[in-house]
Amino acid sequence: MRLRPFTEPDLELFERFATDPALSEPFGWVGFMPPGGYRKRWEQDGLLGSIPYCLAVVTIDDDALVGWVDWRETERPGRGAWEIGVLIVPEMRGRGAGTAAQRLLVEYLFSTTTAFRIWAATEAENIAEQRALERSGFSQEGRLRGTHFRDGQWRDSFIYGIIRDDISGSSPAA
C-alpha cells in the first residue's frame, strides 16, 4: 500500500461511500452525505487544504484505489496532536490494507509535521480496527462511554494513541 493525493477519477469512491450504506457498514455509516461535496472540496484544494485532510490509499502494483485516510488537528490546535481515520473498501478489509494505511499515515505525519501525538477512536465492538491500530503501533489508552450513535443506540469507543517517542529515530519536522 501507499498513500497519494486524490485524482479526479478517485472521487467516484467518495460518491459511492456517501450513497451506499453497504460499503461502510457496520461501523462507518453515518448517513447519506450531500452528493458532490467531496468533488467541490477536491476542486478547491485537492482534499489537502481543509479539514479533514485526506489521502488516497492505493496498491503499489497497479495504483488501485482501496480507500482513504484522513486526519485533523485536535486537542488545542497548534499543540501537536492529530486524530486519524481510515476507510477501506469491503473487498480489501481483513487483508492488511487498513493496518498498512494507518502505519503509513503515522510515518507521514511524524515526518512532515511537528506532531507529538496521533490518536484514533474506534467503536468498542470494532475488533478488526482495534487489531489494525495495535499492529500499526498504537496503544489502547481508554474507553469513552456513549460516543457513537449507530443503529438506534449509543455505543462506547476505545481511544488508541501513539507518540513520537514510540517510534525510534522520529524527530519533529523542521
List where the protein language model places each region:
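Acyl-donor (CoA/ACP) binding surface of acyl/acetyltransferases
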Residues: M1-P21, C54, V58-A174
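Conserved GNAT-fold acetyl-CoA-binding loop/helix
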Residues: A22-E43
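A short helix-loop-beta-strand connector motif used in the catalytic cores of GNAT acetyltransferases and
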Residues: E43-A56
